[in-house]
Amino acid sequence: FFDIIQRYVKNSVLKPVFIGEGSGILSNMLLTSDIDVRDATFIDLQHFLIRQYIVNFDEQAKIQKFVYAQDFDASEIDGRGMTIINQDSFPEIPAEGLKSYFELIKCNKVDRVISYNHLDLRGHSNYRKMLVEYFGEPVIRFESIIRSGYFIEIFER
């Protein structure tokens, strides 16, 4: 997933909003790479935010803030031209939670979403339908060769 993000954003500035990043491994790979990463924002549950803070401690200059997921409000996030990055957790987030995160898209703070999630939505939120409503069909979409049923999709304006 890192390799795909790296190839896609190449020579542009990446202002990531990591939603549900968990262990912090992907964010650390991006923050320590040759990608021009600025103003990274982390939105997650408290124990994961602590882990992400520790893992990315040496990259504090590239980090804007850490936000507790349960209290999230789009007005807490400043900026434009941001990219939401999510791996594995969109389907698990309740629809109301997704709406609050996707408010960042609605108010033009986020221009792109990079998603690596499964599409089996039985018992899960239909995050993909919401993304298509905001962006239309993804500019890139393919099934993972490593994880059957998981798709990498890039939506952007």
Q: Which residues does each predicted region cover?
A:
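Class I SAM-dependent methyltransferase SAM/SAH-binding core
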Residues: 37-62
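Core SAM-dependent methyltransferase catalytic element
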Residues: 140-157
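Conserved SAM-binding loop of SAM-dependent methyltransferases across substrates and taxa
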Residues: 23-36
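S-adenosyl-L-methionine
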Residues: 54-79
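Conserved beta-strand signature within the Rossmann-like core of class I S-adenosyl-L-methionine
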Residues: 109-121
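A short, conserved alpha-helix within the catalytic core of class I
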Residues: 92-105
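Conserved alpha-helix/loop element of class I SAM-dependent methyltransferases that forms part
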Residues: 1-13
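Conserved class I S-adenosyl-L-methionine
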Residues: 12-22
